[in-house]
Amino acid sequence: MLSKIIGSVVGTKNERELKRMHKVVSKINAYEATIQALSDEQLQQKTEEFKARHQNGESLDALLPEAFAVCREASLRVNGMRHYDVQLIGGITLHEGKIAEMKTGEGKTLMGTLAMYLNAISGKGVHLVTVNDYLAARDAELNRPLFGFLGMNVGVIYSQQPPQEKVAAYQADITYGTNNEYGFDYLRDNMVFSLREKKQRPLNFCIIDEIDSILIDEARTPLIISGQAEDSSRMYALINTIIPVLIRSKDEEANKNNEEEDFWIDEKNRQIEISEKGYEKIERFLIEVGELGENESLYSPSRLPLLAHVQAAIRAHHVFVKNIHYIVDDGEVVIVDENTGRTMPGRRWSEGLHQAVEAKENVEIQAENQTLATTTFQNFFRLYDKLSGMTGTADTEAAEFKSTYDLDVIVIPTHEPIARIDMDDQIFLTKLGKYKGIIREIQEIQAKGAPVLVGTATIEASEELSYLLDQEGVKHNVLNAKQHEREAEIIAQAGSPKSVTIATNMAGRGTDIILGGNWQSFIEDIDSVSPEEMQRLKAQWQIKHDQVVAAGGLHIIGSERHESRRIDNQLRGRAGRQGDPGMSRFFLSLEDDLMRIFAGDRVVNMMRAMGLKEDEAIEHKMVSKSIENAQGKVESRDFDARKNLLKYDDVANDQRKVIYGQRDDLLAEMDLLQAIKIMHQEVYNAMINQFIPPGSIDDQWNVDGLEDELENEFKIAMPINDWLDEDRRLDEEGLRAKLIQTALDRYDNRREQMGEKEAAQLERHFMLQSLDKHWKEHLTQMDQLRKGIHLRGYAQKNPEQEYKRESFELFQMMLGAIKSETVQDLSRVHIPTKEELAALEVQQRENAAHMQMQFEHSDIDNMDGGVERAAVQGRNVVAGAAGAGVAGAMAGNGNNDNEPNPYAGMNISRNAPCPCGSALKYKQCHGKI
């Protein structure tokens, strides 16, 4: 209440910001006459002038008014488009590191050129991020003439791009690309073996198009580079056979304590729970087929992977639905993005879910992957010195943008007042009744001559509605994940008179629907068009445009409410662009998922008590309020999940920064000798402590054990007993110093035999190899820790604090293992020739080159015990060769029988891949020690 009173007096924060920016716009406009008077050559020279002024200390803020005026004039001369004042405000917003909410059709692409031009003056690079390769290439080509005129070069990055071309794209003043590609390049850059192989420059300024889609909808999307793990396809196929005989509870809430059912599903959170009866049935089946011993349980430490297979299979059969969450295309399970309706070829759900769905659909079951490097969009984009974004719908998520990314949202006024009319929702008892209501509405709109866009939430809904329209003889086009290749053609004419287009959620499609249709699409297939023919086509289009305007513009029909208000607003925003007329209305039924799961019983009972017929609808404020409350609950739940993820990922992110920083230091450091000597001292000290405890007397010493360990681990024969016999005064401190100095002297001799340059090369090789290997193992351990950490809550412990504590301990152990292995390898390796060293580098690069792009879709919400909601969020994976490296070939025996097992106590399945990266099963490697 107080904030409303204050706002009415001094204006809202958004109003105050707009008022401040209007003053800057006045300064920009004041330059217009002067800039217009310049010749093309003089206008182009302004860029070099700005660069010189900036290098001499003038800030970009100070340059902004004149630079924006120059960019606006250049745009008018090159493209015939002049930035409106509201677009100038948007450009200021982006430059200041904020989010500009600008409605559909208001010119976000043109607006972005202002901030991109200004920030490119610094020479540090500007990244424009889009949601797909098509938009990146389209926008780059669209703006290349403008930036070229101003002396700026433009680059585009894409998957599978030749290395030199990608480097050139990143060196450009302005670079376009997708969020996935920027993120993967960051991870790949931290797996190179030379600084020359890095592609990216330091991350300077970033503008994210459709920022809500990338930083909210995909916030829980880990970017992962992975290698292939053990093939478990037989197990997935086996578990798949038991799922049909498990009994699901019909009334999830009422039967949670009913032991007659085998499992139940919490649809609100998409979680599953198996009853005691269900566990017994599953265990009996696994015992019968020989996968479980008579006295074993699914909760036995070595059998937990089996339990994960079962849970994934139940979710595959009962949570993930064909033609809603995925389609089967050419023998492959392809995920459908619930927010956009697009298929995502190559993406895969993680943690066994995708394999379980493949088993369910009886297609080839592909192998799982092991993580080699990972980050999230949340943490990647926070690496930029300055981050900004633009979208048509951000204000509903303003609180999350501020708390997570420290980004303010500025709502930019429209150039023309919005003429679209948003009608009240119509609510029906049944889905069929709702579809009948939609068809009546379509027929009425068609009779007026207006175009209709029907938005559906799923492929299944679009096909059901299409079938009913066919039955009624209504011509229409369908745009969903199965017709994406016709997308441009369908959208181009979706604004034509009487056209009917059914589309799954249109978020992020990046194409405006023009009233009357897109006349330019008519001439794309014609080789040459005369000026007269061009004028005739334009005149025909103008007639159609005027007809549609007279009929009320584009009419939007939503076939159900989305869980997020933002997606609903994106659908509404397809109509009413740049002051055009339009209308929107949502049709709902009590059978819709949102209504069925979240709407209160009061609403359902009230509608049924009214005695409505199937095709009768009501419009009631209480129902609308109930829907808004339901959407608010879902948005709040998703926000909490993203916030929860960030708490855990921030721990991994801090460790990632340390490892990547050390890796860069290794690549940049010419002389590693001092670091190697310190490493030797630490490793030998730690080993000596095991056999000669600090402050101990000689009766407590295990000298024979120390001699054996030095021989086994480092191939060093030290006559410690002889030293003690020769010098009775040699105490613990003196002996320690002599041992370490002897080891260092021995290493100095080996370096002399190798040669300074060759020794430095070998040191860098072994340190990099050990760091990469143990970081990969550490990521696997962190993933295992995260999956089970929620169980600490049952012991009255804080899972988050426990995760931080244990992950730190794992990190310290990893650093110790890196040092120990590096010293071991350097001590045991035979002195290589120059040819062998060259072969090492070649093999390293070949291993890196084997990586292939693959995506995996997952939710990582299991910190709190939840199951995957992977239809909503995603997980991206790059699959690659995950070999154990080349050190083993040079270092002689890898594991000997006297080595302690570093993975003891970790409850690793004996048939699982050994965490050391040897590619052997655990029972054949460290597990047999």
From Swiss-Prot:
Report the membrane topology from the UniProt record.
Peripheral membrane protein
Cofactor needs: Zn(2+)
Q: Where does ATP bind?
A: Q87, G105, E106, G107, K108, T109, D512
Q: Single GO cellular component annotation? A: cytosol
The Gene Ontology terms for molecular function here are:
ATP binding; metal ion binding; protein-exporting ATPase activity
Location relative to the cell: Cell inner membrane; Cytoplasm
**What Enzyme Commission number(s) does the record list for this chain?**
7.4.2.8
The UniProt entry, under Pfam families, shows: P-loop_SecA, SEC-C, SecA_DEAD, SecA_PP_bind, SecA_SW
Note accompanying the cofactor annotation: May bind 1 zinc ion per subunit.
What are the protein's UniProt keywords? ATP-binding, Cell inner membrane, Cell membrane, Cytoplasm, Membrane, Metal-binding, Nucleotide-binding, Protein transport, Translocase, Translocation, Transport, Zinc
InterPro entries to which the protein is assigned, alphabetical: Helicase_ATP-bd (IPR014001), Helicase_C-like (IPR001650), P-loop_NTPase (IPR027417), SEC_C_motif (IPR004027), SecA (IPR000185), SecA_CS (IPR020937), SecA_DEAD (IPR011115), SecA_motor_DEAD (IPR014018)
Look up keyword Ligase and say if it applies: no
Q: Name one GO biological process term.
A: protein transport by the Sec complex
Question: What does it catalyze?
Answer: ATP + H2O + cellular proteinSide 1 = ADP + phosphate + cellular proteinSide 2
Which residues take part in binding Zn(2+)? Answer: C914, C916, C925, H926
Question: Where is it chiefly localized?
Answer: membrane
Its family remark reads: Belongs to the SecA family.
According to its UniProt entry, the function of this protein is described as: Part of the Sec protein translocase complex. Interacts with the SecYEG preprotein conducting channel. Has a central role in coupling the hydrolysis of ATP to the transfer of proteins into and across the cell membrane, serving both as a receptor for the preprotein-SecB complex and as an ATP-driven molecular motor driving the stepwise translocation of polypeptide chains across the membrane.
Q: How does it assemble?
A: Monomer and homodimer. Part of the essential Sec protein translocation apparatus which comprises SecA, SecYEG and auxiliary proteins SecDF-YajC and YidC.
Q: What is this protein called?
A: Protein translocase subunit SecA
Q: Which gene encodes it?
A: secA
